């Protein structure tokens, strides 16, 4: 297909939370390849409202990385950015109680799916001097009891971005620290079944953030992710950045 003039952005984890809010923020601003394991009513509405600019790739991010890039090129002729947002928190368990297979599943989603998608995106992003925007976490640099698998996966993301910044100077690669966001993941964290593993103090900390209204709105993070995806700033490449700097 002939290359479109608008930016073409691939977005993972697009069916809910930060991903859905980002898809909404990108309306009228870009062509979007929305990748998700499920098609929620909210995402389906976006697809119906934007038939010429939104394409859905349904599947697990561990399986559709290459195919999603190919879809972008086939449909729109180029790729300008990837926003890699899909991720999971579970297993929530202390290391001594860890199920190594559950760790592997988490790393497949949070890290290896990212590496695979980035690998296949790079040749196209070189042509457009595009951007790689990956949702990281404060947990990459801070200990939370029973979150070792998640913390380690996000620390790996930050190092991946540092290496990308060195290896691909024409592509802006950033890891974004989103803060504590009001998403389904936070609902899971506050579940009483996690209190024993996390410890009462940590568990109560997250519950108090919700009750005191301190959680960040997904729409605020979406503004930052959209801005970064649409604007290549070489000075930022390889960095772990705070979302507040871009809204």
Curated annotation (Swiss-Prot):
EC numbers on record: 1.-.-.-
Keyword list, A-Z: NADP, Oxidoreductase
Keyword NADP applies: yes
InterPro entries: NAD(P)-bd_dom_sf, Sc_DH/Rdtase_CS, SDR_fam
Cellular component GO terms held in the UniProt record: cytosol; nucleus
Keyword Oxidoreductase attached: yes
One Pfam family named in its UniProt record: adh_short
Catalytic center residues: 136 (proton donor), 150 (proton acceptor), 154 (lowers pka of active site tyr)
Annotated residues for binding of NADP(+): 11, 85, 119, 150, 154, 181, 183
Gene Ontology biological process terms, A to Z: tetrahydrobiopterin biosynthetic process
Domain of life where this protein originates: Eukaryota
GO MF terms, alphabetically ordered: oxidoreductase activity, acting on NAD(P)H, oxygen as acceptor; sepiapterin reductase (NADP+) activity
Family: Belongs to the short-chain dehydrogenases/reductases (SDR) family.
PANTHER family documented for this protein: BENZIL REDUCTASE (PTHR43008), BENZIL REDUCTASE ((S)-BENZOIN FORMING) IRC24 (PTHR43008:SF8)
Protein name: Uncharacterized oxidoreductase C30D10.05c
Upper taxonomic lineage: Eukaryota, Fungi, Dikarya, Ascomycota, Taphrinomycotina
């Amino acid at each position: 297909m002939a290359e479109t003039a608008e930016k073409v952005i691939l977005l993972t984890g697009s069916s809910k939370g930060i991903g859905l809010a980002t898809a909404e923020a990108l309306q009228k601003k870009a062509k979007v390849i929305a990748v998700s394991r499920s098609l929620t009513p909210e995402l389906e509405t976006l697809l119906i409202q934007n038939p010429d600019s939104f394409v859905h790739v349904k599947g697990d991010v561990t399986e559709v990385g290459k195919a999603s890039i190919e879809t972008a090129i086939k449909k729109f002729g180029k790729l300008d950015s990837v926003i890699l947002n899909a991720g999971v928190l579970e297993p929530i368990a202390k290391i001594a109680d860890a199920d190594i297979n559950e760790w592997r599943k988490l790393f497949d989603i949070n890290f290896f799916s990212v590496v695979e998608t980035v690998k296949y995106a790079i040749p196209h992003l070189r042509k457009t001097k595009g951007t790689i925007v990956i949702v990281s976490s404060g947990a990459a640099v801070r200990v939370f009891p029973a979150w070792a698998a998640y913390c380690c996966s996000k620390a790996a993301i930050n190092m991946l971005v540092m290496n990308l910044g060195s290896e691909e100077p024409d592509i802006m690669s950033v890891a974004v620290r989103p803060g504590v966001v009001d998403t389904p993941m936070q609902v899971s964290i506050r579940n009483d079944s996690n209190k024993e593993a996390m410890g009462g103090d940590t568990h109560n900390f997250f519950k108090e953030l919700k009750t005191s209204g301190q959680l960040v709105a997904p729409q605020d993070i979406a503004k930052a992710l959209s801005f970064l995806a649409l604007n290549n700033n070489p000075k930022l490449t390889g960095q772990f950045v705070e979302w507040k700097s871009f809204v």
